[in-house]
């Protein structure tokens, strides 16, 4: 199972847009703010973490397929990679739920 199959097209365009500005963001990260603090782009971090979740899902799928085909893969490795992918996906879903809740709370606030 691939995680990026479940990302809506609107989110894909946002994530793609954020990665197109990497040169500007990298310059900001190395130079820092005027106050001397380093700025970090939330979109890039989110994109990297979603890519890591996707990679874990793909690795678990490949390990499972190799085991099914009879390759020299230990059952423990299959179970560990599958559980790691499952837990990382559950964490990503919970983070998404919290972000949606925070967004909805911001929309409910009156100015």
Swiss-Prot record:
Its main location: other. It comes from the Bacteria. Keywords: Bacterial flagellum. The keyword Transport does not apply. GO terms for molecular function: cytoskeletal motor activity; structural molecule activity. It is found in: Bacterial flagellum basal body. Belongs to the FliE family. This is Flagellar hook-basal body complex protein FliE. It comes from Clostridium acetobutylicum (strain ATCC 824 / DSM 792 / JCM 1419 / IAM 19013 / LMG 5710 / NBRC 13948 / NRRL B-527 / VKM B-1787 / 2291 / W). The lineage of its organism: Bacteria, Bacillati, Bacillota, Clostridia, Eubacteriales. The gene is fliE.
């Amino acid at each position: 199972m691939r995680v990026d199959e479940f990302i809506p097209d609107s989110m894909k365009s946002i994530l793609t847009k954020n990665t197109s500005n990497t040169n500007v963001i990298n310059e900001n990260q190395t130079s820092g703010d005027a106050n001397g603090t380093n700025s970090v782009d939330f979109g890039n971090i989110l994109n990297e973490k979603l890519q890591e979740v996707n990679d874990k899902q793909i690795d678990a799928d490949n390990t499972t397929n190799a085991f099914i085909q009879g390759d020299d893969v230990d059952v423990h490795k299959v179970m560990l990679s599958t559980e790691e992918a499952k837990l990382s996906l559950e964490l990503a879903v919970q983070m998404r739920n919290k972000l949606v809740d925070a967004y909805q709370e911001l929309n409910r606030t009156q100015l």
